[in-house]
């Protein structure tokens, strides 16, 4: 098969012929139908993920058709169209037995702990736990984005953030997961504020559902601007991941609000406005993806017409574009989401 392989971090990515994967016990092999380019893939190539061992194939946000089934798999047959979460749970540990596969103690992550979907084929581990059937009405392009950005934003905004109709949601960072968070807010009937420093990203946020867009460069105090416009957010999400955006997210909340942290910080330790958390009895909530057992809720939103992930897509690529497109993500050259649809 063809795969986009890098031999070292920050090194060249080459489209080369490698052996087709074989299904281990419990796994299925899928032929990739579409795969998203996510900033996490860029960070992996850049060398910031300790789980990656070179040579490596990234790509963790995909939809595929089952072409081979490993021993012990009972739920899947060749020809089934499936997605999988980027965190694949073992199905047997304590968190998995509670249905919280996204914090599995033995988790596998295609594109990180094992080769991923920037290839013509990949494997889904623990397939009876992690593979999810895609409804016929959902396109390959839309389904691929459910594996990471859309499901992660659902977990953050709907499940962890508990956003309700009529509340105010503030989203810091309008990249892929931020745009998905904006769309989630619109889907549940919230007032959505989008914050970024790129006008084209803010324009795209408006097109997918934000009611208010704020360019942080235009405000000395962006949190004060959020309060002036809305009275303060009930839920605020840091989708970028640094001390400034996290602090601004917290300061944008009204009393008893919920801060959701999705973006990863550059370092493990960072300053954080704990005094405000204590004073206003705020909640601080982490997000590490969505359990496969909850994907049906996301698909239900899509089938109802309330959520359309393809509205975020601005580039459709071929697998042969990955060697140049992945390193280019570091330049933040274009807004929206890129999806490989030709393999």
What are these regions, as identified by a protein language model?
Residues 138-218, 224:
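Mid-domain Rossmann-like dinucleotide-binding core that forms the NAD(H)/NADP(H) cofactor-binding site
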Residues 81, 168, 235, 257-259, ...:
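Short glycine-centered segments of the SAM/dcSAM-binding site in methyltransferase folds
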Residues 243-306, 342-343:
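Glycine-rich phosphate-binding loop and adjacent beta-alpha segment
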Residues 90-172, 310:
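NAD(P)H dinucleotide-binding glycine-rich loop of Rossmann-like/cofactor-binding domains
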Residues 221-231:
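Conserved amphipathic alpha-helix within the SDR
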């Amino acid at each position: 098969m063809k795969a986009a392989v890098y031999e070292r971090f920050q090194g060249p990515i080459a489209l080369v012929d490698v052996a087709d994967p074989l299904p281990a016990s419990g796994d299925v092999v899928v032929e990739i139908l579409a795969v998203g380019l996510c900033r996490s893939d860029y960070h992996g190539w850049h060398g910031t993920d300790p789980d990656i061992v070179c040579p490596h194939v990234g790509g963790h946000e995909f939809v595929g058709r089952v072409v081979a089934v490993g021993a012990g798999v009972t739920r899947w047959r060749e020809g089934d169209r499936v997605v999988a979460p980027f965190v694949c749970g073992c199905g047997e540990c304590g968190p998995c037995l509670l249905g919280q596969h996204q914090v599995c103690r033995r988790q596998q992550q295609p594109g990180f702990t094992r080769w991923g979907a920037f290839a013509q084929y990949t494997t889904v581990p623990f397939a009876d736990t992690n593979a999810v059937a895609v409804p016929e009405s959902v396109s390959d392009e839309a389904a691929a984005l459910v594996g990471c950005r859309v499901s992660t934003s659902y977990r953050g905004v709907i499940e962890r953030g508990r956003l309700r109709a009529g509340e105010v949601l503030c989203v810091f960072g309008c990249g892929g997961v931020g745009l998905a968070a904006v769309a989630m807010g619109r889907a549940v009937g919230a007032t959505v504020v989008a914050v970024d420093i790129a006008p084209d990203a803010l324009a795209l946020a408006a097109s997918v559902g934000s009611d208010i867009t704020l360019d942080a460069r235009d405000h000395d105090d962006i949190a004060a601007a959020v309060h002036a416009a809305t009275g303060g957010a009930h839920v605020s999400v840091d989708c970028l991941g640094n001390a400034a955006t996290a602090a601004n997210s917290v300061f944008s909340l009204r009393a008893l609000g919920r801060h959701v942290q999705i973006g990863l910080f550059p370092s493990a330790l960072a300053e954080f406005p704990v005094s405000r958390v204590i004073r206003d009895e705020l909640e601080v909530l982490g997000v590490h993806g969505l359990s496969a057992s909850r994907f049906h809720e996301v698909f239900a939103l899509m089938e109802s017409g309330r959520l359309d992930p393809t509205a975020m897509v601005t580039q459709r690529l071929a697998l042969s574009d990955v060697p140049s497109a992945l390193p280019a993500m570091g330049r933040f050259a274009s807004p929206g989401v890129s999806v490989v649809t030709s393999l």
